[in-house]
Amino acid sequence: MSNPLHVHVPWRLLESTLPFLIDRGLQPEVAFQGPDLDRAPAASLDNVGRALGAAGLAVTVHAPFHDLNPGALEPLVAEATRRRFLQTLEAADRLGARLVVFHPGYERWKYGGRDHLWLEQALRFWPPFIDLASRQGCAMALENVFEREPPPLANLLAQLDSPFLGHCFDVGHWHLFCSLPVDEWFFALGSRTIHLHLHDNFGRADDHLPVGEGSIDFGALFGQVGALAARPSMTLEAHDRPALLRSLAGVAPFLVR
């Protein structure tokens, strides 16, 4: 069975972190900021992709998200988002990535209860990306961020209904923002869940603590994951090496079940 586990690595640190990743057999989820995509040389992306492939390590990618929104009503914001996401898929292709995580841009306070405004724009935005991703053989996953309930993401994914566009369940964001128990979230979106983001908090801030160091019930989460028809890949979103090592230890018992 293929290794499902990845670890968060910013693009700016990836080349210097490669020896550590290869030595430990850790697969990166490469996180890009917008300016990274303007500056990253194609040759560097190709070289890193080849090095990881030669080591037998798979790659996932996290797209930039600051100030971007694929459901934006403002055409200039939508165009900036389109440009960055196209750059992200190009970088992912050079790295040999087979999955890219995107933020959906939904914030209920922005739309004043008129979620259909965001949904209508998102339904127009994603089809060209689905076509491109299918040609690259690269899946895309929309991550829950501020969603209190599943319908915004569930409705979008159901209407687009593509095997190349699924859901990334971020357990830290769910614990912080969602009003539903994890089994109800998975009842709505489990069949479309293809990736997980794993980090911990106490329900007060997006702390990105190592797995097991906050108040999230990871046993309940992995109970839901174990019932899925296909096991999702997953990324530990630790933001420094000591936290990563503790998170690896924290998640290990759930990966051997």
Annotate each language-model stretch with its function.
Residues 8-16, 32-46, 69-72, 108-112, ...:
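Acidic-and-aromatic substrate-binding clefts and catalytic sites of carbohydrate-active enzymes
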Residues 3-9, 28-30, 59-63, 100-102, ...:
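Hydrophobic faces of well-ordered beta-strands that scaffold small-molecule active sites
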Residues 42-47, 77-85, 115-126, 179-188, ...:
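Charged helix-capping and loop-helix junction motifs
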Residues 2-4, 15-22, 98, 150-165, ...:
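Histidine-acidic metal/acid-base catalytic patches
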Residues 48-66, 121-135, 218-225:
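Alpha-helix-loop-beta-strand connector modules within alpha/beta enzyme cores
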Residues 65-69, 106-109, 200-205:
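Conserved radical SAM core fold
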Residues 71-166:
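Active-site acidic/histidine proton-transfer and metal-coordination neighborhood
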Residues 1-93, 256-257:
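N-terminal pre-domain/capping segments
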